[in-house]
């Protein structure tokens, strides 16, 4: 086993550092750091393992000592980051460790009993600290409101205080500004630099403890960005505070030095922070990278934020498209109809086959990151999403602020005991239960996007001008069939079969693609909807429908727009003229069923509009076009040319023509 060196002497057979668990039970042994590289994480193969704590990443971080200089650094390899004192160190970043640093693997702002924190102590003679200072540091961490105004006043008068390093002096003169709302650790750094002779004797005789320690500690899962809200730096953490502003995938420390030179608020003393440890950190970084492969960005992308593990049988939520394990979201949707990540109202739950295939391919290359068989069986048993489905209805709803915003699994806007998710329950505006809910007093406006809330649909602005009597008086039968609007994803009564018998029922589907739309039935409520379903002659295609309308050829499309503008015509006038030509048989469409009265959705209508626009442009007399347009030679490939999207080629050749070469 490799040992760190001290000068030119051979290393003694003893640990070079130790970790003291903050808030640990009496009698729990300290973690002695004996190896050159010490790994911490949830994976059972780590030197310090937390197999039951889902808030700790599989490979959370590693502590490495440089054999030549004795410099100790911590490198973060987690998905959520590691907190040193009050500074968050993110993935692939290294930070030098000093005696008295508090390392948080899990931080709970309002529930400190769930924290997983260790106090680092160097056992070398140059960086040794007394046991009394550690006790004071631990007390200050858990009692952050203690006044420390006089803690630093007597530091200069105490002859027992060792001389401060240049880095420490600069840090105390220029503390890094805080970005949090409160000072969480006001005394941790000050108290950690006050040793006493009695404490030094105690620190030399530390308890024994080895690798492979698996401390207890598991808590409810939280979002991975929870610790980012208190990333204010302690005085002795200024070096890492600047490195934390760099990209996470930075491979060396040289750009950090350049950035510090470029900052206007740093002087020559500030550069001393990285002058000495930079070479050591580079050496350690290269050794660590050669020793073991780092978790790549693919693993971070394929990680579920609820269980903090690789996705298993993942599902995506619509419309926000955030992805979770099916078993994880099954437990969440019992309590809330909001997305765990963005709090957007969930309308539909779908299997994400692409991500599932990516996870399988990733596990083939990294079989060590596979879940255990017991974990897989447990998740399959908890999975209640076996097929694509609507978001289950939640009966009782409350405001998001009523739950704990710190705990992802405990945050809930509903009472889980009253939830009924045995069957997906769809309620539309014309269901009797929806009317009963609408008759009740108005709710708190927080869950306004939830299914069943009157504000979500009934009061939303509609794109429909008026509703017929057949639509207004209709009431859904018990367990009646519903169709989901392809535009706004809101349910409506499925009356397409009834329309064949009663023409008064508004159309609910496109005549070409047969997809359901609610615009003609009661008005689509999606923001930005121009009217997703209408007769072709009444379809609103928007003012930008002429952009690239001619085979995505912007140059030819601009020629047409200029032609219409000089004659005071709009796209609606052109559509009217084209439909008249279509009725006479002058223009033709690829779908012969489409006429001016055919009910089309926006996409199918835009496709037919582009076909008519090409024929309209083709029939413009050459005398009505500029000479620069008519003097261009025809392209061999004509309208089928794949290069016409390039401006230079489009300006040089005419593409409103048929292909003349290689037509077979």
Swiss-Prot record:
Changing residue 536 to S: In a patient with non small cell lung carcinomas. Changing residue 635 to A: Abolishes poly(ADP-ribose)-binding and poly-ADP-ribosylation by PARP1. SMART domains: FHA, RING. It catalyses: S-ubiquitinyl-[E2 ubiquitin-conjugating enzyme]-L-cysteine + [acceptor protein]-L-lysine = [E2 ubiquitin-conjugating enzyme]-L-cysteine + N(6)-ubiquitinyl-[acceptor protein]-L-lysine. Changing residue 641 to A: Abolishes poly(ADP-ribose)-binding and poly-ADP-ribosylation by PARP1. Residues 1-21, 142-267, 388-417, 439-461 are annotated as: Disordered. A zinc finger (PBZ-type) spans 633-655. Residues 38-89 form the FHA domain. The modification Phosphoserine is found at residue 244. GO terms for biological process: cell division; meiotic spindle checkpoint signaling; mitotic G2/M transition checkpoint; positive regulation of proteasomal ubiquitin-dependent protein catabolic process; positive regulation of protein ubiquitination; protein destabilization; protein polyubiquitination; ubiquitin-dependent protein catabolic process. Its EC number is 2.3.2.27. Its main location: nucleus. Poly-ADP-ribosylated. In addition to binding non covalently poly(ADP-ribose) via its PBZ-type zinc finger, the protein is also covalently poly-ADP-ribosylated by PARP1. It comes from the Eukaryota. Keywords: ADP-ribosylation, Cell cycle, Cell division, Metal-binding, Mitosis, Nucleus, Phosphoprotein, Transferase, Ubl conjugation, Ubl conjugation pathway, Zinc, Zinc-finger. InterPro entries: CHFR_Znf-CRD, E3_ubiquitin-ligase_CHFR, FHA_dom, SMAD_FHA_dom_sf, Znf_RING, Znf_RING/FYVE/PHD, Znf_RING_CS. Residues 400-417 have a biased composition (Acidic residues). Interacts with HDAC1 and HDAC2. Interacts with PML (with sumoylated form of PML). The PBZ-type zinc finger (also named CYR) mediates non-covalent poly(ADP-ribose)-binding. Poly(ADP-ribose)-binding is dependent on the presence of zinc and is required for its function in antephase checkpoint. CHFR is silenced in many primary cancers because of CpG methylation and deacetylated histones on its promoter region. This however raises the question of whether CHFR silencing is a consequence or a cause of primary cancers. Belongs to the CHFR family. This is E3 ubiquitin-protein ligase CHFR. The gene is CHFR.
